Amino acid sequence: MDLTYTDEEEAFRAGLRDWLSLVLPELPAKPSPQDWPGRRAYDTAWQRLLYDAGYGEVHWDASPTQRLIFLEETEKAGAPYVGANFVGLLHAGPTIASEGTPEQRDRWLPPVLRGDEVWCQGFSEPDAGSDLASLRTRAWRDGDHYVVSGSKIWTSHAEVADWCELLVRTAPVSEAVPKHRGITWLAMPMDAPGITVRPLRTLAGSTEFAEMFLDDVRVPVANRVGEENDGWRVTMVTLSYERGTAFVGEVVACRRVLGELAREARGNGRWGDPALRRRLGRLSAEFSALWRLTQWNVSEAQRTGGVPGVGGSVFKLRYSHARQELYDAAAEVLGAGSLDLAHEWTLDRLSSLSYTIAAGTSQIQQNIVAERILGLPKGR
């Protein structure tokens, strides 16, 4: 494993830094977390800037190391994250790039890269979260369309999305068809008749998630990514990107927050508490280790062809808990100020509670690590 950067990679870093120094001072103020239409406009405008500068495809066509450099430098510079483009850039886009037909790639990828279209994720259901393969949303063929009925929950960005990466059951579960089979991956247009979206307000006041109800929604068969009943395999590609790369920029952000916490503690007198200093030191070591793990995962992805491997589950497991510990420490540093919902760290602390659940619970990640890395049996 080689964790050093080549001259070409360092040149990429230098060029990116120069570009960021020019464009970031000109950006408008970021909308509030509660203003999702405003956030969509802001996030897609940022993506268009990246596209025009030649950085729009960095999540797909660049090498894994260049993606890592991009996420590191944009976060250090305080640039916007992917925001409303999250599903399109980090879930659906890489999946379509890997599994889609040439026609599908030509249709869906350029609008995502330009910031013209936003995607949401329709995976989880009220009775199919961690056990995603238990999903019940049904799709049946009617000529050159699928007719879809069912419901989804925790649908990211549904309120502002143009498209949905949707998992449906196209064959009922039976002795001949286990639940992991009979699933199909569809690209559903969000303006199709029969779709009802109800926003879900989080503890932090955001409505980035929603319930979605589907009543005989017609989706063209041409919008199927992969083969019918082979959607679980396609979904594993999606989830490998979600767990392998989607949180990389956040590690850089957490390391920055650690420095800010130390400065805040020195300023408000809490730095004199040795227990707090030990806590922050332990977190610093944890996030340094997570960054090295990220570099290792990226090195492995580059060696094996670009798709993140199961090492992403190790990262997701450790990062979820470390993030919660970080913002618990932030509450200790802020004291009574941690009750102020206008403070960024307070909102981050509330949102961190979901990290051991979202994108696969910690228990699911432990199972993946046990079975696919340690080779332990599946017996319970």
Language-model features, listed with the residues they occupy:
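C-terminal helix-coil-helix/basic helical segment that borders enzyme active sites and/or dimer interfaces
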Residues: 28-37, 266, 270-277, 288-344
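A short core secondary-structure module
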Residues: 144-145, 149-198
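Glycine-rich beta->alpha junctions and the first turn(s) of the following alpha-helix
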Residues: 3-5, 195-290, 355
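Amphipathic, small/basic residue-rich leader segments at the start of a protein or domain
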Residues: 1-86, 107, 111, 260, ...
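Internal helix-loop-helix
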Residues: 47-110, 114-115, 157-163, 287, ...
